[in-house]
Amino acid sequence: MAGAKEIRTKIASVQNTQKITKAMEMVAASKMRKTQDRMAASRPYAETIRSVIGHLALGNLEYKHPYLEERETKRVGYLVVSTDRGLCGGLNTNLFKKLLSEMKDWSDKDVQCELALIGSKATSFFASVGGNVVAQVTGMGDNPSLSELIGPVNIMLRAYDEGRLDKLYVVTNKFINTMSQEPTITQLLPLPAGDDETLKKKSWDYLYEPDPKALLDILLRRYVESQVYQGVVENLASEQAARMVAMKAATDNGGSLIKELQLVYNKARQASITQELTEIVSGASAV
């Protein structure tokens, strides 16, 4: 059994770690609330433009944009959104696991995959496991801006425009609630038709001013950018929620460990006192 002094040192060490994890839990909770506000502010725009684009995909368009046309799938692209920091449980691991499973399905069909990575965790992961990485961006912090995402998005859109990609997806964690974050893979291009039954029952048609091509070129590009940005914001909210839960679990586990060490310490101290009393009694008997 370890000595009483050694056990006291371990207890002090765990208590110090517990203070750190508690502070990190509080910081994550504060950041999560701010990120949730940002997510709530951007979500109406993302959902509205997704709805409009869904109508377009179902409509009888005067001009058929390339982003609306299905192609034979030979190459697919993924915009992968991860975190820049760790200590957020299995958030990134679950996302990468889902992505690798889908990439394997494509590989079995002889379809090649290209990756544009957002976040240092995705960069380090695919540096170790391998992958055709064509773009990456890291260090966006807690206040990501669309301008920081334009680089990877433009690279993937250019590849799609030039026919080097036949499908484009965004991979991110969807924020459900504080305790639940769901890894999702959403198709961006070709434009998926709206899945709302009420939309499918209607015949959507549009008049474009001044020119359908110019309008759709801008609108569809903004659609892709908005969905990627919304994915980044939701992933950030998921990160802070997962980190808050992970740090709370670490703090609670620290408390349990302290109780166990305190019990061991009490037993060690009791054994030491018993031994001293035995030695005193033995010495007195010898006299």
From Swiss-Prot:
Keywords of this entry: ATP synthesis, Cell inner membrane, Cell membrane, CF(1), Hydrogen ion transport, Ion transport, Membrane, Transport
Pfam families xref list: ATP-synt (PF00231)
Membrane topology, record value: Peripheral membrane protein
Subcellular localization(s) per the UniProt record: Cell inner membrane
Gene Ontology CC annotation, any one: plasma membrane
GO molecular function, one term: ATP binding
Domain of life where this protein originates: Bacteria
GO annotation terms (biological process): proton motive force-driven plasma membrane ATP synthesis
Chief subcellular location: membrane
SUBUNIT field: F-type ATPases have 2 components, CF(1) - the catalytic core - and CF(0) - the membrane proton channel. CF(1) has five subunits: alpha(3), beta(3), gamma(1), delta(1), epsilon(1). CF(0) has three main subunits: a, b and c.
Stated name of the protein: ATP synthase gamma chain
Organism field: Photorhabdus laumondii subsp. laumondii (strain DSM 15139 / CIP 105565 / TT01) (Photorhabdus luminescens subsp. laumondii)
Lineage: Bacteria, Pseudomonadati, Pseudomonadota, Gammaproteobacteria, Enterobacterales
